[in-house]
Amino acid sequence: MKILVIGSGGREHALAWKIAQSARVSEVLVAPGNAGTATEAKCRNVAIKVDDLDGLLALAQREAVALTVVGPEVPLVLGVVDRFHAAGLRIFGPTAKAAQLEGSKAFAKDFLARHGIPTAYYAVHTEVDAALAYVREKGTPIVVKADGLAAGKGVIVALTLAEAEDAVRDMLSGNAFGDAGARVVIEEFLDGEEASFISMVDGKHALPMATSQDHKRVGDGDTGPNTGGMGAYSPAPVVTPEVHARVMREVVEPTVQGMIADGVPFTGFLYAGLMIDAHGAPKVIEFNVRFGDPETQPVMLRLQSDLVDLLEAAIDGKLDGAHAQWDPRPSLGVVIAARPYPDTPVTGEVIAGLDAVPASAKVFHAGTALNAAGEVVSAGGRVLCVAALGDSVQDAQRTAYAGLKPIHWSSAFQRSDIGWRAIARERQAQG
């Protein structure tokens, strides 16, 4: 069978790589893909943009694609699933209405409140003066979020009143995020440890994937501005078996049932960005309606089941009978980005050393392309993610960083401490 993966990032390379391992798959089409998917076994890039729904639909029909997997949020919010369904094609992802869980933070917060799912207190504002008054009343630290899609960057954690006021003004009157910032959600700052809890959902049932923890800040020690994510590891030790049970009971199940109750059943990858407090109580920071990036890369390294079998079960509404097998070893992925990311990065630089990466690490491509000479060049902010398995998180970290050592181009940089929380825990446990 032929499978289509929509997207061009590290997440899509990891999904295509895992899908290509299935004996049931003859070819994986990736639209538009990157330099990694261009050379991955059984994969072929097709130059169609993720927001070209007509082109994607025509491709799936022309190539007799058996099923389509959507990587990024943009085509989901635009309604790619609705278009494919209308044409009678099999596709895994939420409808445009269900994708509002990510497409609008106000929609998500109202949904959480309506269904009694734990989250931070919040208010939605469209007027600068009212928003500023609310911020002054609540005090800091406080979180200001652009309502719409902002590629993971429309969130300001304000530690001072001046920062909060600047964020409100930037988003509402300065138009820092265009239409995405025409409304802002202002919410309480949550204390605790973050975890990414991703489930496959078939409309009625949820099958949890391995947990993971992302590193959002650009700098070591979680400093500097937020990014789309600088690295991740799986599993997240903060999600103990007890916390896992609570998340399923208090967050995932009520979300699946709540979407049914609202007449918008959810099918797809449901990503709950959680804050776990000192007592193990989870609160939802945000929903994404697709697999995380860079979490997908280490999570796919650990998945031992045939992903195609799971996708088929999800599309057929049969996840209650499905089971996912995981490598017990932890995995860790480090993003190599291009300066000055998260500001507009330098692109078009030739990436050297990819052929010298040891077999113990897997390089997933994100913002890469092939130039006219067939060389791999940088083409985005987050360029590569080097991932590895290990007997411990520290071991996986060591192998991943050894794996990225030969890779270089002049604007390249990465954090040196991905996995630091889990490694501190491991050291503590060893006494």
UniProtKB/Swiss-Prot annotation:
Signal peptide: none annotated. One of its GO terms (molecular function) is metal ion binding. Its cofactor is Mg(2+); Mn(2+). One of its GO terms (biological process) is purine nucleobase biosynthetic process. It comes from the Bacteria. InterPro entries: ATP-grasp, ATP_grasp_subdomain_1, PreATP-grasp_dom_sf, PRibGlycinamid_synth_ATP-grasp, PRibGlycinamide_synth, PRibGlycinamide_synth_C-dom, PRibGlycinamide_synth_C_sf, PRibGlycinamide_synth_CS. Residues 109-316 form the ATP-grasp domain. Its EC number is 6.3.4.13. ATP binds at residues 135-196. Pathway: Purine metabolism; IMP biosynthesis via de novo pathway; N(1)-(5-phospho-D-ribosyl)glycinamide from 5-phospho-alpha-D-ribose 1-diphosphate: step 2/2. Gene3D superfamilies: 3.40.50.20, ATP-grasp fold, A domain, ATP-grasp fold, B domain, Phosphoribosylglycinamide synthetase, C-terminal domain. Binds 1 Mg(2+) or Mn(2+) ion per subunit. SUPFAM superfamilies: Glutathione synthetase ATP-binding domain-like (SSF56059), PreATP-grasp domain (SSF52440), Rudiment single hybrid motif (SSF51246). It is an enzyme of class 6 (ligase). This is Phosphoribosylamine--glycine ligase. It comes from Xanthomonas axonopodis pv. citri (strain 306). The lineage of its organism: Bacteria, Pseudomonadati, Pseudomonadota, Gammaproteobacteria, Lysobacterales. The gene is purD.
